[in-house]
């Protein structure tokens, strides 16, 4: 398949630049895979779409304030973007560095509160290994001085409100540099209402990486190499998923990150084993889903791997018809936008 088959026209004014005042005040498009029906309800109405015996799987990753602004000792402005921590080393991170001159080993960047960032050596891809001194209490320092890593299509600087709103209400495990955005619509009250319908809620963790924003640089999908993201499935969640499937309930993924995690971990019969690993599965039309029965997701960028995943789940023709309806009805797109429930 060609990447160009997943392009569509999106008026720029439909890209949500701010979250709504209330998380669950967004709109929800409903997409029925069997009958092809497309509808619209307030997101709060999602409660009525659940059935007793369903299982809602959420991603409890927590976004770190990964953007740091500083100056080189020579005075030049420098932006450091934390990508991921080097395993076993609390002081050294894989980072992207933006400055007037290309980075080189030994360069020191002066950061707030006397912290220094020293460029060590090239990492993988476009990253550099950077050590932060003093490293003790680094996470607390980062919470005070880092900025939330808003996606590039949000054309403004992150502000104090984004520290709360670009984070799900169930975020627990630090490590993501982008939010699992389908979860941004959920409130504690909504989750309680869903549980009150006889629905279980179970977490997985997938630390969303920068690869979620990376464009596909090949013409054919089959030639694309997917990025890797760390995931963890607790034993209780694996048991809940396997029990739900045995009892005839639906496994409902809250977001593409949950979907990728479960499909990465699933055996051929859909059984899920607890554990951790790296998800590098690339899902596009033709893929047969083993673990996920319904999907809640936002609207995704043209020609993105996430759009291809959702096309595989809904069927490309139905999904693009739904996207056409969403544009015509002036839905809000991307991270701070509206959502759809595909079942």
From Swiss-Prot:
Gene Ontology biological-process entries: queuosine biosynthetic process; tRNA wobble guanine modification
Keywords: Cytoplasm, Queuosine biosynthesis, S-adenosyl-L-methionine, Transferase
One Pfam family this sequence matches: Queuosine_synth
Functional pathway: tRNA modification; tRNA-queuosine biosynthesis
Subcellular locations according to the entry: Cytoplasm
Single annotated GO MF: S-adenosylmethionine:tRNA ribosyltransferase-isomerase activity
Assigned GO CC terms: cytoplasm
Record-listed E.C. numbers: 2.4.99.17
Reaction(s) catalysed (UniProt annotation): 7-aminomethyl-7-carbaguanosine(34) in tRNA + S-adenosyl-L-methionine = epoxyqueuosine(34) in tRNA + adenine + L-methionine + 2 H(+)
Similarity field: Belongs to the QueA family.
Quaternary structure, from the entry: Monomer.
Protein name: S-adenosylmethionine:tRNA ribosyltransferase-isomerase
Organism, scientific name: Geobacter sulfurreducens (strain ATCC 51573 / DSM 12127 / PCA)
The encoding gene: queA
């Amino acid at each position: 398949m060609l990447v160009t088959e997943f392009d569509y026209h999106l008026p720029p004014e439909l890209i949500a630049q701010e979250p709504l005042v209330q998380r669950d005040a967004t709109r929800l498009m409903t997409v029925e895979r069997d009958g092809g029906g497309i509808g619209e309800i307030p997101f709060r109405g999602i409660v009525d779409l659940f059935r007793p015996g369903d299982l809602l799987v959420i991603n409890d990753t927590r976004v770190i304030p990964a953007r740091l602004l500083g100056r080189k000792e020579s005075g030049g402005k420098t932006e450091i973007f934390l990508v991921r921590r080097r395993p076993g080393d609390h002081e050294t991170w894989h980072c992207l560095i933006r400055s007037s001159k290309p980075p080189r080993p030994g360069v020191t960047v002066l950061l707030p509160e006397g912290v220094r960032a020293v460029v060590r050596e090239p990492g993988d891809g476009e990253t550099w290994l950077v050590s932060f001194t003093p490293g003790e209490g680094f996470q607390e320092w980062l919470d005070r001085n880092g900025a939330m890593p808003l996606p590039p299509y949000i054309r403004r600087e992150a502000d104090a409100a984004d520290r709360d709103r670009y984070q799900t209400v169930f975020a627990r495990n630090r490590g993501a540099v982008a939010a699992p955005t389908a979860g941004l619509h959920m409130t504690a009250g909504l989750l309680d209402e869903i549980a009150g319908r006889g629905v279980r809620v179970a977490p997985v963790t997938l630390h969303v990486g920068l690869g979620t924003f990376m464009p596909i640089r090949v013409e054919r999908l089959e030639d694309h190499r997917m990025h890797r993201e760390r995931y963890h499935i607790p034993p209780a969640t694996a048991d809940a998923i396997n029990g739900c499937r045995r009892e005839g309930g639906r496994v409902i993924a809250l977001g593409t990150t949950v979907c990728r995690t479960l499909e990465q971990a699933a055996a051929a019969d859909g059984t899920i084993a607890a554990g951790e690993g790296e998800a590098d599965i690339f899902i596009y039309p033709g893929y047969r889903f083993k673990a996920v029965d319904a999907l809640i997701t936002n609207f995704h960028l043209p020609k993105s791997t996430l759009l291809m995943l959702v096309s595989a789940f809904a069927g490309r023709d139905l999904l693009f018809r739904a996207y056409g309806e969403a544009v015509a009805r002036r839905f809000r797109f991307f991270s701070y936008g509206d959502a759809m429930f595909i079942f």
